[in-house]
Amino acid sequence: MEPGCDEFLPPPECPVFEPSWAEFQDPLGYIAKIRPIAEKSGICKIRPPADWQPPFAVEVDNFRFTPRVQRLNELEAQTRVKLNYLDQIAKFWEIQGSSLKIPNVERKILDLYSLSKIVIEEGGYEAICKDRRWARVAQRLHYPPGKNIGSLLRSHYERIIYPYEMFQSGANHVQCNTHPFDNEVKDKEYKPHSIPLRQSVQPSKFSSYSRRAKRLQPDPEPTEEDIEKHPELKKLQIYGPGPKMMGLGLMAKDKDKTVHKKVTCPPTVTVKDEQSGGGNVSSTLLKQHLSLEPCTKTTMQLRKNHSSAQFIDSYICQVCSRGDEDDKLLFCDGCDDNYHIFCLLPPLPEIPRGIWRCPKCILAECKQPPEAFGFEQATQEYSLQSFGEMADSFKSDYFNMPVHMVPTELVEKEFWRLVSSIEEDVTVEYGADIHSKEFGSGFPVSNSKQNLSPEEKEYATSGWNLNVMPVLDQSVLCHINADISGMKVPWLYVGMVFSAFCWHIEDHWSYSINYLHWGEPKTWYGVPSLAAEHLEEVMKMLTPELFDSQPDLLHQLVTLMNPNTLMSHGVPVVRTNQCAGEFVITFPRAYHSGFNQGYNFAEAVNFCTADWLPAGRQCIEHYRRLRRYCVFSHEELICKMAAFPETLDLNLAVAVHKEMFIMVQEERRLRKALLEKGVTEAEREAFELLPDDERQCIKCKTTCFLSALACYDCPDGLVCLSHINDLCKCSSSRQYLRYRYTLDELPTMLHKLKIRAESFDTWANKVRVALEVEDGRKRSFEELRALESEARERRFPNSELLQRLKNCLSEVEACIAQVLGLVSGQVARMDTPQLTLTELRVLLEQMGSLPCAMHQIGDVKDVLEQVEAYQAEAREALATLPSSPGLLRSLLERGQQLGVEVPEAHQLQQQVEQAQWLDEVKQALAPSAHRGSLVIMQGLLVMGAKIASSPSVDKARAELQELLTIAERWEEKAHFCLEARQKHPPATLEAIIRETENIPVHLPNIQALKEALTKAQAWIADVDEIQNGDHYPCLDDLEGLVAVGRDLPVGLEELRQLELQVLTAHSWREKASKTFLKKNSCYTLLEVLCPCADAGSDSTKRSRWMEKALGLYQCDTELLGLSAQDLRDPGSVIVAFKEGEQKEKEGILQLRRTNSAKPSPLAPSLMASSPTSICVCGQVPAGVGVLQCDLCQDWFHGQCVSVPHLLTSPKPSLTSSPLLAWWEWDTKFLCPLCMRSRRPRLETILALLVALQRLPVRLPEGEALQCLTERAIGWQDRARKALASEDVTALLRQLAELRQQLQAKPRPEEASVYTSATACDPIREGSGNNISKVQGLLENGDSVTSPENMAPGKGSDLELLSSLLPQLTGPVLELPEAIRAPLEELMMEGDLLEVTLDENHSIWQLLQAGQPPDLDRIRTLLELEKFEHQGSRTRSRALERRRRRQKVDQGRNVENLVQQELQSKRARSSGIMSQVGREEEHYQEKADRENMFLTPSTDHSPFLKGNQNSLQHKDSGSSAACPSLMPLLQLSYSDEQQL
């Protein structure tokens, strides 16, 4: 096939062998075993056992090498021929001043070489043109038909190839006095393995790569359409070939150069009357060229016509020998000869431009011998790491995928495509033939400097170690002393993708073995030795151009050829992929090649076995014909092995004897011929001491050893006896024989070999007589062992006779071991298998038939007699059944002592086992307190299935099976009751337990069911007890009962009721928590509702707050100082709550005294020794921005706590004069340590109490809430009495009058607002006694910034308040100490309450009016409010922008989907809530029917009934949806109303 025309088809796979560990121990023996199969393929692959994994011993850090450079398309033979052809034709045109540009046809570069070959095969240019077969040429070049490509090919052929072909044919070499080069093949120097490189041919000094690359750059070629459209192109198409065809691919280098050389006139001009040399050109083409008009363009100048005849006669055409028509006479720039343009072949239509050379000069230039092809070394030195990085990067970039993901099939097809392509130049590098002796072997080596581990020592001595295999005893190379690199010393190979090794056979046609240490696979191709000559013939036939210049091309490892091409010509080829850890073996004269799939590391070496010797001799004769150097002397190797025959392996000795015999016969014949020639002189020569180059035949380059012919007069050379006529021309009397051994010494050596070879026959005869007992005498065991030892010591081959001897010895040893066991009683042990009676008789017969005399046969006969006697006794005992169990057991023990298995002993064993099993069944089923388990019963049943059947055994087995089935069924039912999701009522469990009481088996699930039923009954009793008690059950008790009930696998009706009660109680507590607790509060609900137990300890309160900041929440379970049991008594709870109130009041008074004694943070300086306040943040509050708690009198940072807001009144009032009523401003500050909850209003708490009354559960929080409510109402009553006293009422009237004075001159637009605002104020009346104190405020009110000038918004309000601060004066009331003290005490007690009451606010305003305004606090609050206002504005802007973006992004469809989802969720939520509501109503109705109140001793009914009327007196103008409790709590300070 043509390379590259078809897709690559992989050849069949070579044989693959996987030896066992036993076979793997003998490498060369195993190779000899598989040789008949593997040799037919040429190569084979061996996979070692999986555990054989030698360590990689190369020192990676010190490993440096320089690889070879391989250009892939120069490796393939046919591609190289094409490239050489392109070089030659390019050189042809370059000499004539034109550069070659290869045209493109159908978007592919035109294959000029194939076109030339096909034209020649089709009969030549003239014949194809005559028959118009250019379309056939296009078809053979695989171009599609119907596109007129044939005419285009003809144009290219005429323009580029035809002039070169005419030149090559010699048609235009008329009268050219040129002498052809000597074609005699010179001796090609072959470097033996001691030379570093196998590829001895050096690369060309001048790389043709750049020239080829330039040629392959496509230029636009004229198509057929262009030729038809442009007449000038059509005219140029029929021109003859030549360098004048510029623009069609052949361009002159110097367009403007004019060549005109003048030749001196010779003294004599001889005109020869000869015929023109152009007669062999077709007349049609010649006429066509002669009929063309000369070109009118600027061309080379012709010689001018001179009037002198001398000048006319001096210009003579070298072809026609005429000087006429000198205007068409062309002058050569190389030799100064003259030619008519029409005398040239082919003729030229005009004088060409630029430099022109005649055919003689072109011939001289083109006939220079080509330079030999070889590999060049890379310029960069690599380490293993750097080379691997380069290789992996190249492969991944080339295939555009990770290296490990590239299929091997893809790499293989791409490789053969690249080597066959003249268009793509891919260059790779290959670290080949790296000396392991210099760089280190990949296998561990024993003589290395490093200390080897035991594992490494094992691999260092293994026969498969490539450093060991060539020097094994069975190997021939172990008898060569020199370390031949590559043959005895391994070579290393570091490959990358596409790096290749070309077709070759090993030196001396030896074996080779290659091991891939690691890396990606290596692809191999192999050809068997029988087809080696056929492969050489095919390659020479397909590429004769290469072999004409290099006959030994295949020995240089530089040439590839596509396996498909070889297979198409009948060469059998196989392939394989060698993976890491695998061996590949090549057999003698088996051609092989291949390439690497990627980055890998391999090691290879040669070895020679006994069967190689004939092939080695044939190889020497082949080398002699090719005149190739030998690596070693084959004769020397044979003689060296023959000199020490006892050290040879027997197979090797036999093979050496045969080779030695043939060599001696040939030596006698050659010496006889030398004697007949007349050479009589001779002298002994120790050839092995001479260097190889001093004992090589000057004719055939063979290394001489046995003999050589030399000459006294020509001492510089010698010849082998096969070329005695090629030494010199001297007389035979001057020639003499140089010999190593005489003809008498050679037969002696041959005889010693024969003895060694025939020693095996002598030994084999002895073994045959012993094994077949031919003399009638059996040999002893020691005699047979001596024969086997002799074979091992003398290293006889592993023959069939030796195997028979080994088998016989093995049988004898086995018989002796069995006999010793019988006699000594060793087999009586239970772990030793016993012989049967039949086997004992067979053993006796075997011992008698073996060819070995054994005295143990008498012992075997005695044992056989004892066994037969025992057998008779056992039969008698079995015949008299039922016998006593003791007798049977004693007979059984005696039989076991014999060491032989008797059939009757088996029956005795069965009887004993049956009796034992029946006893165990009776004991298990006997009524007793301890019942057997199911496992025991199942074990008995399994044992009963194994023993032999009998009526009693069958009956017991049936009863046991029935009992087990019943027990398992009830166990399954009990398991279902325990594990089922739907729990069963106690009645069902009691029924199951009653049914299983009569089963005599311990049932674990039934027992678990009993325990569960007992627990359920106890749980029901606890529920009844707690439900029937004096009080409602506590929530903790119910939760504990629910948790226990849920874990019980019993269906309990009371559990659902308890779960609902617990759920309702949790719901109430959650609602109460939301009402009281702040977000992320550090207090529990119970702590908030109870009096503060640590009110007097400032450190305790602050530690509580720090625990909240750190997330350390703790629950105080003894807030009231009561145990869990005491909390169940409502009376104890009330008493403890009262005591807690008193402790809280005492504690806060102590804390106020302590904090009041601390220096104020607003003071200019603080004493270091005095105690200071600590804020909740842990720092000391100081400077501006600190606030003092009105309850505990401690100081805090304003930014660390929640502060009151001054702007709490409606906005219209802020722009009017009543703003000066500073005592009504919300400046009261309670720290987070004092204000622990949200402090809901009293009406909210009363709603929680109403819900609590419906709960049939007691909660500690409910008790605490009831106490808190009673405490709050009690305080409210005392506060109302205090506010209703005459003195306080008078003070309240003064404040009311003062407010009226401040509201006297409102703005017109604010009048309506003030009217509504003052109507709702509870402080409406006052006294005129202190009107003068606020007169200044009224007068200065006109100077206040007018509302019109204030910007709207909260910022303007804060500015207004700030502007009013200088105008605030006070106090506005005079509070006597008798009034102030009770009010302050009431204020303190009200602040302790976690409830919001209006009376608290009224008392606060009264106390504020009776003292000067706290300007520092007001300024601090204003600054904090401004800071908060700025942050809120920034957040509001960002929020507004985010909302706008969301509105733009949201679509109508999304809104619909959201609405649908919300509706579905509401529907589900309403369904769930309605279900819960119905359940709550059900249980509430039940509770109402049973008159279940909160507690008998503490009833909410009187308290709630007392406020029932106030709930009904709701303001008729109120728009609230729920009943209001404000009429109950609100105070009226008018004269018409009473408190």
From Swiss-Prot:
Biased composition (Basic and acidic residues): 1477-1491
Example GO BP: T cell antigen processing and presentation
A Pfam match: PHD
Span of zinc fingers (C5HC2): 697-749
Binding site for Fe cation: H504, E506, H592
Ranges of residues in domain JmjC: 458-624
Matches recorded under PROSITE patterns: ARID, JMJC, JMJN, ZF_PHD_1, ZF_PHD_2
Alphabetical list of InterPro entries matching this protein: ARID_dom (IPR001606), ARID_dom_sf (IPR036431), JmjC_dom (IPR003347), JmjN (IPR003349), KDM5_C-hel (IPR048615), Lys_sp_deMease-like_dom (IPR013637), Zinc_finger_PHD-type_CS (IPR019786), Znf_C5HC2 (IPR004198)
Molecular function terms from GO: DNA binding; histone demethylase activity; histone H3K4 demethylase activity; histone H3K4me/H3K4me2/H3K4me3 demethylase activity; nuclear androgen receptor binding; zinc ion binding
Residues annotated with Phosphoserine modification: S291, S307, S884, S1346
Cross-link (Glycyl lysine isopeptide (Lys-Gly) (interchain with G-Cter in SUMO2)): K205, K229, K244, K272
Keywords: Chromatin regulator, Dioxygenase, Iron, Isopeptide bond, Metal-binding, Nucleus, Oxidoreductase, Phosphoprotein, Repeat, Transcription, Transcription regulation, Ubl conjugation, Zinc, Zinc-finger
Expression by tissue: Expression is highly down-regulated in metastatic prostate tumors.
Named cofactor requirement(s): L-ascorbate; Fe(2+)
ZnF bounds (PHD-type): 316-362, 1174-1235
Cofactor annotation comment: Binds 1 Fe(2+) ion per subunit.
Biased composition (Polar residues): 197-210, 1494-1521
E.C. no: 1.14.11.67
Record field: catalytic activity: N(6),N(6),N(6)-trimethyl-L-lysyl(4)-[histone H3] + 3 2-oxoglutarate + 3 O2 = L-lysyl(4)-[histone H3] + 3 formaldehyde + 3 succinate + 3 CO2
Residues binding 2-oxoglutarate, per UniProt: Y430, S512, N514, K522
SMART domains: ARID (SM01014), BRIGHT (SM00501), JmjC (SM00558), JmjN (SM00545), PHD (SM00249)
EC main group: oxidoreductase
CDD domains noted in UniProt: ARID_KDM5C_5D, PHD1_KDM5C_5D, PHD2_KDM5C_5D
Family membership: Belongs to the JARID1 histone demethylase family.
Domain notes: The JmjC domain is required for enzymatic activity.
Protein name: Lysine-specific demethylase 5D
Organism whose genome encodes this protein: Homo sapiens
Protein encoded by which gene: KDM5D
